[in-house]
Regions:
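Mature exported/compartmentalized surface modules and terminal targeting/interaction regions
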Residues: 2-3, 7-260
């Protein structure tokens, strides 16, 4: 997709599946990087005290049924409430260069929950820049805050991706199994180590993507939603770890509000 067509898509002059992008005057903006995780805990924004009344993120049971009691304890604290797999990342038909996801974003309290940000990838990575990162240069990701990143640095968006790493808390064992890769970084981090760093860039790109796809299909066999979310990292995000981005706050598109 050339820049002219993408610009038309972004600003809503044609439909073609892309949402109309409406920037928030005086909204947050800056630069940073996108990390990844999926810990199966209750989202921070599912608590009324964090999100504000009527703005709570959805929560689910381990069987993925909705839980409507906003005071339900998190699975990571011995309770029944976990992240809904409907909050996996996804794409929209006819909008090839924009992805959609939920994330833990920097900040705290009702000022963060339910807000959306457009991330525009620079084509570089925080710790390395490989072909995987370069291929993200014209891609964008719209994220909606459903978690509060108390340990997330300024400009960092911790994107919710099944198999992206369970992090400090792990509520996933009886939902998604135990073979979820490195504690921080998940299946992709395992693939990066398995492929190694001593091969040429093209070979590294191909092998990392192939490795991650195989792991997504194997680990999440029989768990379609989790597998789709995992494959989003392999396909749309090109198996690129910690890509750099510029971000700007926008009005939330309906496709994310419907899943929040």
């Amino acid at each position: 997709m050339n820049k002219y067509i993408l610009a038309i898509c972004l600003f809503g002059l044609v439909t073609s599946g892309c949402p109309t992008i409406k920037y928030i005057n005086g909204g947050l903006s800056g630069s940073g990087f996108a990390s990844r995780y999926w810990d199966c805990c209750k989202p921070s924004c599912s608590w009324t005290s964090n999100a504000g009344s009527g703005n709570e993120a959805r929560q689910c049971s381990t069987s993925m049924g909705r839980i409507y009691d906003t005071n339900a304890r998190s699975k990571c604290d011995g309770g029944p409430s976990t992240t809904c797999l409907s909050q996996k990342p996804f794409t929209v038909s006819g909008c090839d260069n924009i992805g959609f996801a939920f994330a833990a974003v920097p900040g705290a309290g009702p000022s963060v929950c339910g807000r959306c940000f457009l991330l525009e990838f620079t084509g570089q990575g925080k710790y390395e820049t490989k072909k995987n990162h370069a291929l993200l240069a014209n891609k964008k990701l719209i994220v909606m805050a459903s978690n509060i990143g108390y340990d997330v640095a300024g400009g960092q968006f911790d994107v919710m991706i099944p198999g992206g790493g369970v992090g400090y808390y792990n509520g996933c064992a009886d939902i998604l199994g135990n073979n979820l890769g490195a504690q921080y970084g998940g299946l992709l981090s395992d693939c990066e180590n398995e492929v190694g760093y001593g091969v040429d860039d093209n070979t590294m790109y191909t092998r990392r993507k192939e490795c991650l796809k195989n792991k997504c299909n194997s680990v999440f066999s029989g768990k379609a939603d989790a597998k789709d979310g995992c494959l989003f990292l392999a396909n749309f995000l090109e198996a690129a770890g910690n890509p750099l981005h510029k971000y700007r706050e926008i009005e939330c598109p309906q496709v994310l509000k419907d899943r929040y």
